[in-house]
Amino acid sequence: MAEAPIVVKVGGSLAETGRLKPILQLIAASQRPVVVVPGGGQFADKVRDLQNAIRFDDAAAHRLAMLGMHQMAEVYFTLEKRLAPADSLDGIARVLATGLIPVWLPLQMCQDDPEIPANWSISSDGLAARLAERMGGADLYLLKSIDVLPEASIEEVTEAGVVDPAFHGIVARAGLNWRILGPSDDAAFAAMLAPSPAKFQS
């Protein structure tokens, strides 16, 4: 039986720390099936700045922020040739079947999804959780530019602003296994990408 893919959200902030390329190299060498969710990073930040300047509505900002994730994906494609775009569950399956690693482009699946709020209460973290839910409850890893204690609860990371407000509800509804990985966790992340990793621990 084929191993179930994991969902890995690669935070856009990693591009500002020098950690992005090494992480993408680890993912490109993965011996497990992986679906990458790109963070919006500075592209999404610019949407927020522009909205503050000219006051367009949250629904438009939500779509533009998702397109910021698409822009970040384009950056990822230039850095690792084993990454390929996918904008649907079927597309993800097709890319995985070729032996490549799908990078999810969220707009098509998310713009009319009634489970996704069209505002700033959800970011790429919550969207990654929603994708994991729609994939049947895939294990979810969020790669961040800060370290988080392994024992930190979902309530604590939400209160601290480490994840978006919508993340908690999606994870709880879907019963997802999840973990946040910071700079100190890269060796552990590499081990998770081996063919038979240790049992998931959130």
Language model feature labels by segment:
Residues 1-199:
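Nucleotide/pyrophosphate-binding catalytic subdomain
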